[in-house]
Structure formats: C-alpha cells, structure tokens
Design a protein with these regions (language model features):
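Active-site helix of classical SDR
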Residues: 116, 153
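The beta1-alpha1 cofactor-binding region of Rossmann-like NAD(H)/NADP(H)-dependent oxidoreductases
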Residues: 56-66, 98
Length: 255
C-alpha cells in the first residue's frame, strides 16, 4: 500500500492508538488528535518520528478546522480521515441526565459531523479521499439497555454517514465513505464510560489489535461497511429478520 496521510481522532488510546501504531509501521504519515496531551504524545512517540500530534477537542468546530489545517501545512495533503473519537455511558433511558446527554451526543455525534464538515469540502476540491466513521454494533442492535443514549448517538452516526454517501455517490465517486461497526473490544473504553460498565449479555470482546488490523485493511481496500466481528454481523441480520421480517437494506448486509 502506498504511503498515505491519515488523520485519526481519539488517537490517545484504544482503537485509535492501536490503529495509529499499525499504520505507522506500514509507513503511513499520521496526524493524531485527542484531548489528552500526555497520552497523545506517548502514542505519537511509539509511532516514531515524522508524525503530527494535535491536541484537539473534537466537540469544537474550530479545533477540528485547526486539525485539518495543521495536517495540510505539515504534509500538504490528507488522504484518509478517521472519525474515531467516542465515549461510552452506562445509563438506562430514564436515568440519563441533561449533562450526560449533551456529553455523549457531543463526543459521539457532533464530533463526527464536524469531522465530515471540515474534511469533505477538501476531498471534493481534491476529487478523492476516504472518510472512515466509527460507529458500533449497538447502533444496529440495541442489545443492552444501559447503553441507551450511546446506542442512539451511534445510530445517528450511521444515518449521517449514509446520507453523505448518497450526496456524494454520483457527483464524487472517488470519495470513499466507510462505516465501522465494532462489537465489544478489549480496551479501556467500557471502564472509562460514564457510570462504569455493568455486567450483562454481550459478545465476546475482540482484541483491539485484531480490530485495528481490520481497519488497516479497510483503508487499503475501502468498502461501505465493516463489521469487525463476524458474529455481530450475523446477530444484526438475525435482529432485522426477527424484528421486521426482512434482511437489512443496502450496505448493512455487507461484511
């Protein structure tokens, strides 16, 4: 795979950090973004010299614009933009407070919208590019009630992603739009969720390195939808059949 310039938000830990390290080993140039300066610097250090680390609050448009502009100033182009930043919460519907609602919507949804709004105009001018939005299996199958508002925010990410795909399909066919749907992943994401992470029915967690490896392949060979866990893809299909008597439409029926 030829060297690409890749922006990754939420790069200070979890999937973002693992993805960054794998891409760096393959010779790509990275622009890494997160709020936590110390942790972000440590990830950038593990990636080796020549990469860019930009302390970024993804819930602020001006920060996302600054991330884009700093990347273009350093590398002169952007090939791939990965909207990875996110935060979990463990609250049932009737337990969610206004502050928690705002936090989860801002980090999981607003940040994705801002990322799309700052990079897609550049991709359109350039005539090509690849946008990768991180969602969740729970956006398709709301399997656990205590992930209520998190699942809802990620469902909205799916809708935004598909709407953008429709907007660009005919006018800009060389701009790839990908949606990634992880199931459970062995990271600190659940531990750091607001309210912790209660025990309950769940898929066996995937190793974060496995998920990152699948995303590296997605960047090499773009496709509309990636379920990182085949079991979650099958459960999603079964959910649609059981609930609606039909298979999921469009890209959601793709592995």
């Amino acid at each position: 795979m030829e060297s690409k310039v890749i922006v990754i938000t939420g790069a200070s830990s979890g999937i973002g950090a693992a993805l960054a390290e794998k891409l760096a080993r393959k010779g790509h140039r990275l622009s890494l973004a997160a709020r936590r300066e110390k942790e972000l610097g440590e990830v950038a250090g593990r990636c080796g010299p020549g990469h860019l680390a930009v302390v970024t609050d993804v819930t602020k448009m001006e920060d996302m614009q600054r991330l884009r502009d700093a990347t273009l100033e350093r590398f002169d182009r952007i090939d791939v933009w990965v909207n990875n930043a996110g935060r979990g919460i463990s609250r049932k519907v009737l337990e969610v407070t206004d502050c928690e609602f705002d936090e989860i919507i801002n980090v999981n949804l607003r940040s994705v919208l801002y990322g799309m709004q700052v990079i897609i105009p550049y991709f359109r001018r350039r005539g090509r590019g690849h946008l990768v939005n991180l969602s969740s299996y729970l956006s398709i199958v709301p399997q656990v009630s205590y992930r209520s508002i998190y699942s809802a925010a990620k469902s909205a990410v799916n809708s935004l992603t598909e709407s953008l795909r429709i907007d660009l399909r005919d006018s800009h066919p060389d701009i790839a739009i990908s949606l990634v749907l992880p199931g459970g992943v062995s990271t600190d994401f659940a531990k750091n969720a607001l309210g912790g992470s209660p025990r309950g029915p769940w898929l066996k967690p995937q190793d974060v390195q496995e998920v990152a490896g699948l995303m590296v392949d997605l960047i090499r060979h773009p496709r509309p939808v990636l379920f990182t866990d085949p079991a979650s893809a099958e459960l999603a299909r079964a959910y649609f059949v059981d609930s609606y008597g039909k298979k999921p439409a469009g890209g959601f029926d793709q592995k």
